[in-house]
Amino acid sequence: VRIAEETKEVDALIFVGLPLEYNGKLYNVAAGLNHGEILGFVPKTWLPNYNEFYEARYFTSGEHVDGTVHIDREAYKERYDSDFDDVEFDIEMTSFDGFEELEEIDDEDFGGENFDDEDLFDDDEMDDELYEEDIWISPNTIFTCEDMPKLQIAAEICEDLWVPNPPSVAHAFHGANLIVNLSASDEVVGKDSYRKSLVSAQSARLLCGYIYATAGEGESTQDVVYGGHNLIAENGSVLAESKRFANGVIYADLDIHRLDNERRRMTTCQFAPDLAPEGKDISYNEAPFTLENTETVLTRKFDSRPFVPGIKEERERRCDEILNIQAMGLKKRLAHIHCQNAVIGLSGGLDSTLALLVTVRAFDMLGMDRS
């Protein structure tokens, strides 16, 4: 609640990780915030309980959670203390089967005798309609931008990405084209390369943007070390990557319209709200948010020759691949019709030169005399 209040003037969709008690269970959740509003809580689905991970000791999987959390901001305002660790507020749990439970918290000791909430809250600045909120808690939530209808965002948490069937797969089938991952992935020798390839591959499989933010070096403990390895990927390409073991910010320009076009072009898997992977009859909640649609300086660089690699070794490998693909096709055709020679009309241009090179390679593959 406090973070939402502090960021209500920030024009951004912000995700914050936190533990949340719901119906007597503790969940590891990502909260989506926008202009002072808490849009929804997304609980973690897959809980690691191997090697250095012990999440199942404390948390419950949120795979089947689908309900609302009622937050009374007026109660929070009255009980607010300058020490954030002591902040508590009334939470009413409501699920769709009609279960309701209201937990009353004794606030006798909140604030102390010198506590003055007027110094901390301004009634004129705090919207009356936000005093009480019913907020979704469900892994099946898509955050939709009212100002950019094609931008649809979903969240998953750390281990959710590392399993064979990540929640982001269903998110993508229901329209999400940008996935955010709030992670606490510790550092082990070689793990950064695997992590990077995982993020890149997932963005390619789902034809989406993928933002991966992990715990920083200041959160390391005696048991694990965190390197703050943050990544931004789009359709298989890593657009930004942070330096490990250093705090900082990364950013990148994502081409949402390009992703949308790629999804229309790839008809094998239809990305639409009414479709999902086989056996996944899932209903999704929409959490609308707003962003000011303004022009900014483009930081992303686009190559004027996108099909010609700038690195010499990669360029030579690409040219050799082109020759092999064409020569293999010609080889198959020559063998099929039992042809022992070829006639090429040479104009001296690039096309006829390429035709000659392809023919020579095809003859070599067949073991035929070039002459």
Each predicted region: which residue ranges?
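Catalytic nucleophile loop
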Residues: 352
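Conserved G/P- and acidic residue-centered "switch" motifs that form tight phosphate/ATP-binding loops
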Residues: 349
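Enzyme catalytic cores with a strong preference for nitrogen-chemistry domains
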Residues: 1-103, 117, 122-345, 355-370
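Residue-identity detector for glycine
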Residues: 98, 111-112
